[in-house]
Amino acid sequence: MIQTTFPDRAVMAELLAKMLWEIKAVHFNAAQPYKLSSGMASPVYIDCRKLLSFPRIRSTVMDFAASTLLRDAGFEQFDCIAGGETAGIPFAALLADRLSLPMIYVRKQPKGHGRNAQIEGNMPEGSRVLVIEDLTTAGGSMFKFIDAIRAAGGIVDHGIALFFYGIFGEERFADGKVRLHHIATWRNVLAVAKEQKLFDDKTLSEVEAFLDAPLAWSGRNGGVSELSL
């Protein structure tokens, strides 16, 4: 089903943030920080994979993703949708179905046997590929998949993350010649927390300290204090 409605961006961001709270996908633990794929320590973590277990929410989020892409990228800009191992794969399948496009998936590394393939599915050379991930912090993991697709002859000018941490600029994407699309950020989640009083004052203060200076917070709490972008 092709998307034909285009909700306001702020409404989509707020609703996704509320959905994440509703399904208990927002986690906080400053005493034992979460380790992100970037190596950063974080007092907060979003489990976007939980979205898959709630059909009404899952469908709405795919509506939001399709709306975002069609409005901001265009209706005929992609030949296929790619999901990265592992969290991006189910979302790629859902979005490809929503946009009536083929789907491929990309392994973190070649599987080491058989065809030794890193990309699974049909991707003719020159295909314009959209890469989707459930979330991204600074783009490091997404670019592993983008680089593999480009090496195999695909063209990647766009990526989408359902949730973007929003704590860094998008320089990595600009440098890699990829436009990043996203629906919500931590600021949206925090706004809902304040509105509905879901965090106490101490927790709010700790989360805001992280969002305002993420690498400094990470370095003080056992994570990396700089990123290679």
UniProtKB/Swiss-Prot annotation:
Protein name as annotated: Orotate phosphoribosyltransferase
Pathway the protein contributes to: Pyrimidine metabolism; UMP biosynthesis via de novo pathway; UMP from orotate: step 1/2
Binding locations of orotate: 137
InterPro entries: OPRT, Or_phspho_trans_dom, PRibTrfase_dom, PRTase-like
Keywords: Glycosyltransferase, Magnesium, Pyrimidine biosynthesis, Transferase
Phylogenetic lineage: Bacteria, Pseudomonadati, Pseudomonadota, Alphaproteobacteria, Hyphomicrobiales
Cofactor(s) essential for the protein: Mg(2+)
Function: Catalyzes the transfer of a ribosyl phosphate group from 5-phosphoribose 1-diphosphate to orotate, leading to the formation of orotidine monophosphate (OMP).
Pfam families reported for this sequence: Pribosyltran
Residue positions binding 5-phospho-alpha-D-ribose 1-diphosphate: 107-108, 111, 113, 133-141
Catalytic activity: orotidine 5'-phosphate + diphosphate = orotate + 5-phospho-alpha-D-ribose 1-diphosphate
GO biological process: 'de novo' UMP biosynthetic process; pyrimidine nucleobase biosynthetic process
Keyword field contains Magnesium: yes
